Amino acid sequence: MSFESTPVSLVKCATYDEDLVYQKVKEAVDLLGGMKNFVAPGQKVLLKPNLLSGRPPEKCVTTHPLVVKAVALLVREAGATVLIGDSPQIESAKKAAHKCGIGKVADDLGIDIVEFEPVTVPNPDGKMFKNFTIGKILTEVDRVINIPKLKTHGLTTLTLAVKNCSRNAQGRVASKDLPRRGRPFCQDAFGPLYLY
């Protein structure tokens, strides 16, 4: 599948009612062929929500915990093992997750929250970087499911799912580089992060 023909599904969800969120996330995934189209039984799958910082869901900074829960349940129903992780800007992933409600989801479902321990990986064809320091867990899982929070950003206007992958690079390093280098940097730098 090429990037030019990647399908997208959009489903409206009027409230953060737990049953409704699950139903709508499942509907969106089913429009793309179902979770079994993305993960296979026995695979290890990292859910990558936006855990920028430990803010409660009503502050709209991080991915809503009920969305993470719905995706986790769908991945499990497809027979895969689920992990949750990110590289928050200031605190550990576990601390941020518990502050924003994702930690409770992980506890309730028996899912491990993993920290992004740094490892350097090559990127020989990169325009901006010839290597990246990313979370080691990204090299150890079979799949990564990006679960961003829809919001705006000063360097990319509307980030959609792209900016959430910048957290795959070590959080504090990524946050220092972005404002200093500007929009062209963001556009050329984010693409190669999807390779890992």
Show where each model-derived region lies:
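N-terminal and secondary-structure boundary signal
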Residues: 1-196
